[in-house]
Amino acid sequence: MDENLSIDESMIPYYGRHYAKQYIRGKPIRFGFKNWALNSSDGYMLQFDVYMGKNAESVPQGYGVGGDKVVDLLTKANVPHHKGFKLFIDNYFTSVKLLRNLASMGICTSGTIRDGRIEKCPLRPIAAMKKEQRGSSDFRFTDDGKILVVRWKDNNVVSIGSNFDTNDIGTCKRYARGQGAIQIPQPKLLQRYNQGMGGVDKMDQMVAVYRSRIRQPTRGLNPEEG
């Protein structure tokens, strides 16, 4: 099992009638069955759950709908604890509380995080950072030093939390009007997150090449009728 894992949603296209069919605006596959998938960084799926509606989700464990699903998938996939596995998730799942729990399990985790889930972490406000130049950043550790939250300004402002990574700064290439390619500061935490997060997308790309079409069942003729 690859040490780098990621959890994300994956869509199976379907245009027939079914109570579990979802519509997600703005996605490459807008109609179909939504799955929560746990994948290795090379695209192999380790575990998945088909989304059947809010009322059919996992038993609440106190981390919110997304966070509970993370714990559920890791448990079903029998991901070993304290073995150096790294998990990358997006802001649907991440909370400081979840990061603490996964740290206690020895699962190193980084994930983009919504402003309402950072537990009043005193970072510079998003509205203020939107006015700053690209590459600006801010960070804070929790009082016990176990959870790091970083906020970075690119075209938009993004926040990311981690229970294992550091706040060191690297650079990334961006294009500026009238200047061409330029280098701007970027937290290495975000660079490592971007490298580790693509397992589900890679699987979707490979599946799309050999996808089988799902047809809606049709009612056959009854020979006794007519």
Q: Where do the protein language model's features map onto the residues?
A:
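Acidic, contiguous segments within the catalytic cores of piggyBac-derived transposases
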Residues: 1-226
